[in-house]
Amino acid sequence: MIVVSKLNKPIKLKQVIHKDLRGSLTEIFLRKKIKFNFCKCITVTSKKNVIRGLHFQKKFAQHKILFVLKGTINDFVVNIKKNSKTYGKVYKFKLTAGEALIIPKTFAHGYSSLAKENILIYF
């Protein structure tokens, strides 16, 4: 089990996608695999070459799970915890549809959109 509150770096996840003749079903979040209390769920759409970020919440910091529903992005995550050994370290991830990223609350986050249409879900 991944306990999000204990993470000290981002983690890329490959989600399980079940496909058949009708289409597909993707397990985005399973509580038995990831211990995570989220306060909201939002979707973001971005066209090709859009850059978003670097975002973080200072007063009400929160962990995030980012899931790519459609498209491809280059995701950048930066450690902003000043007393951390890895303060300022940048992590880069290329995420495609069906992949997710867990981002600890002490990290800023941004991405560039690579596909014509990109749809992301945040928890």
Question: Predicted regions span which residues?
Answer:
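Conserved metal-binding segment of the jelly-roll/cupin
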Residues: 94-115
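Non-catalytic, conserved peripheral segments adjacent to functional cores
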Residues: 1-95, 116-118
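N-terminal secretory/targeting leader peptides
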Residues: 120-123
